[in-house]
C-alpha cells in the first residue's frame, strides 16, 4: 500500500531533513537557482514549470516550494533553459502552458473534502496533482494522474521515495530506459518492470540505467533522478517511475511529430553525440589479455601480413604491477612508447584499460585516502572492496569530487597515456563495487547510485580535450547515464557469456540502449566469459572446427557462434572483438571460419563511407543510426515489439542468426516499401514475413527501396584515404543520401571546417542520380560509379 503524508507532516519532515542532511557525509552542492515560468500551489503540492525550447517542458512537484524551484539534476544542460516559447494562461479550470509544439494543462486544486475512514486511520494523502500534455495537433498524448513522496531513512538520511504515475493507453508502447538484457527478442517494455539501476551482476547481463523513455505516442520522458529507479510500463493501465531517493518529482517531456525530433530534443537537454575518430568505425581487436608487448605487436603484424583490415589494438587489464599502481609492468611491456610507435607506423591506434580502484597496498592508496578522494563508509573511512569479493579489492575513486577527478586524470595521462596510447578504456564504470550504503563527496551514494559513469568518464573526456585540443577523443565505457553520449564514449554490454542465448539477448538490448540516446553501443564479439568445458550443440556445427581446438577445446560449435556473432557485429556501431580465451583473432577459429570472418571484415570497411555519413547524421540530429524498426515504420503494428532485427542506417535491414545450426530464418519486412535481398538481389514487397536462406556465410540482409549506398575502396585501416568506388542505388522510390567526409581525427568538423558533403538524389521516374557538392572539394564524378541494383 502506498505511504502518504500530509502537507504539514511533509514540511516538518523537509525542515528536519534540511537541518540534519548527510551528517555522515560532506555537504551537498548547492542547487542552481532557476526562474520557472510559474510555480503553482495545489493545496500542499508545489508545481513548477520550465521550458527548454518550444517542444520540451519540465515539470517539478514537491511538498516544499524551494525544492520545486530547484534546477535539474546531473546530466541535464540547464543552460538551455528557455521559457520564451511558452504562454501561461491561468483560469478557474487550471493553468495552461502553450507553445507551438505542445500544451500542458495542470488541473486546479481539488475542492475540500471530508477525510475518509482510511485517511483518518492511515496518514492523509498528498494533495493530488493531475496534468495533461497535448501535441501540436491537439491530441492528448500524456496524462499524469498521481505522484508520491513516501518518507524514509536511507543511509542515515531522512528523505523520501518519490514517483509519478501516468495513464497507459492500450495501444501505447515504450522503449529505452538504458540497457536491460532480460529479453531474447521482445523489444517493447510494455508489461515489464525495469529496475533502472547500474548492476554488473544482473543475471541476464549487466544493467545500465539511462532514464530516458520514448513512447510510440511520439513523446519522450527524461526522468531527472540519479537514484535507483523502477519503471513500470503499462501494467494495469498505468505507467510509473519510482525512485529510491529524492525530495521532489522532476521530469522532462519532449514532444515532436517524428521520432528523430525527439532525439534532437534529448540532445538539447543532455548534449550532442560527437563523431568518433574514423578509427572507431573499423575493427577493434582485443582480448583478456595480451600478456606482453611482443604478443600484442605480433597480432597487429599478422593482420597486416594477412591483409585483414584493422584499426585499433587494445591493451586490457593487468599490464600493471598492482591494481591502482597506475604503472606499466616493465617485465612485460619494456618500451610502451616504442610499441605504440610501431602501431602508429602500421596505421593503427591503441586503447589502454585504466581502472578506478586502488588496492590498499598500492602506491597511491594512502594519498587518496588522506585527501578524501575515495568512496567512504558512514564513519568517513575509505571503503575497501575486498571483503565483498576478491576481485573488487581496493578503494574506489570518487568522481563526484572535482579534485579527485582531476587527480585521476592527471595520473592516467602522465603515467599511462603519455606513453603513446591514443585512447583510454575506462572499465568498471557502474561501478563493480556497488556504492549503496556508502558516501560520495556530494552525499549518500544511494541518492546518486547511477551517477558514477557520467562524472568519471566526463572527467577523463574533459581532460583529453584540454591535453589534445585538436584531437577527437574516444573512450570505451561499460556504463552510461543521462548525457553520457556527449563524452564521446563507445559503450558495450559488459562481460556477457559466450553462448547462443547471450547472442540473442544482444539485439533487443542494443536497440533499447540506442533508443535511450546512446548511439555508439556494441558488445564483446564472441562473448567475454571463458568457454564451458564442452559443447551443448544439438546440431552438427556449420563451421568445421579443425584448427581451433587450442582455443575452443571441445566446444565444436564455438567457431560457428563466433562467425555468426561477427556477422552481426559487422552491422553494429562499433565492431570490437574481445573475450577471455587464448586467442580472439580472426584466424583463431580454423580456416573455414577465417575465410568468412575476413570477408565480413572487408565488407565493414567497404561500408565506412555509409557508416561515417550516418554518424554525421547522428551528430546533427541526435538520433541513433542503429534503429529499432518502430523508429522508421511507426505505422506498422507488426514492428512494435520486434527485437530480432533492425535498421542499420536508413538503408539496411539486418536480421542476425542467433540459433546454432540455423540455415534459414523468418524475417519480417516492414510495410510501406519494397525490399531487396542484399546477397541475391531478389525483390520483396513489404508488410509480410518471409523465410530466407541463411547459409553460414550470409547474415539475412535487406535494402530498402530508394536507398543510396556509397561503397569505399579496399583499405587496411582508416589511416588510408578511402575513395568512393561505387554508388549503389536500389530503385523503386525516390531517395537521397548525404555523403559526408572529413579528416577523421580532428575537431574541425565541430566548427564546420575541413568537411565535404555531397547530396546524392535518386529520381525514380527518370532513373537518374544527381550529385550536389558543397563546393569545398572537387565535385564527385558519379557517372561511372553508379550501379543500379535490379
Feature names for model-found ranges:
Residues 9-20:
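Bacterial N-terminal signal peptides
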Residues 47-49, 59-61, 97-104, 131, ...:
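Short, well-ordered beta-strand segments enriched in hydrophobic/aromatic residues
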Residues 42, 87-280, 287-289, 293, ...:
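Catalytic and substrate-binding clefts that recognize carbohydrates or anionic sugar/phosphate headgroups
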Residues 129, 462-473, 480-492, 513-523, ...:
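Catalytic core of carbohydrate-active enzymes
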Residues 64, 73-75, 143, 159, ...:
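Aromatic- and carboxylate-enriched substrate-binding clefts and catalytic-loop regions
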Residues 35, 50-94:
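A low-complexity, Ser/Thr/Gly/Pro-enriched, surface-exposed linker/loop concept
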Residues 49, 101, 212, 303, ...:
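Conserved, mostly hydrophobic/aromatic
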Residues 22-24:
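Boundary at the C-terminal end of the N-terminal hydrophobic targeting segment
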